């Protein structure tokens, strides 16, 4: 198993990022795969790093067009983000995207679907919770100090804080192999080496803003009935109750329970790609 640093170097050489400005927001993105296929849009988790999806690109680009992008720092709220995404998709002629959203990216997918319910081709939600009233209430309790933490993040010595943030990321390890633990450690070390304070402030602001959203309801997802895949680890950051509430929101979802924790999206990417390919094949039947 190659380490993250080695893999991301090869990936960025094979798939260089491009930049485009849409309505004042700069999108850093990779667009690859079948030009005449359905478009899979990958929505990043809490570090807003498109590199988290690198193992998914070659594994899925032969059957679909794939779009990866970082959330633009000009878009400061989740409502601004989904409106900006909509304009971004229109620029490239992307219609009815199938969202693959992990962790907080799964929540962004729900907000987008709530706003544009008839313009979503499917939902693949991984290691995430629902944007329902119960989950938002639980998250508000869990993150009641988020405004204070955000204030501190803007003013702290960020370089000195990085080791603590890496340790926090590694706290999501759950019974992974020694090889997987080493990969995760190298991933966080590599990402944080050049990670900018402004980027962390931006994504942390988006995470805090999740608590300000209007809760979604089951009716928001009626238009994607039968086009929903949920991949739920049994030792995830999101509790079993949150997973149950997510399931209740969805219409006729396919549910795949997997062994692992919150980092399984990256550490078990090959297994997840196979699951996604099977689901896409079933959707096409």
Description of each model-found segment:
Residues 1-38, 63-64, 95, 281-285:
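Alpha/beta-hydrolase fold catalytic core
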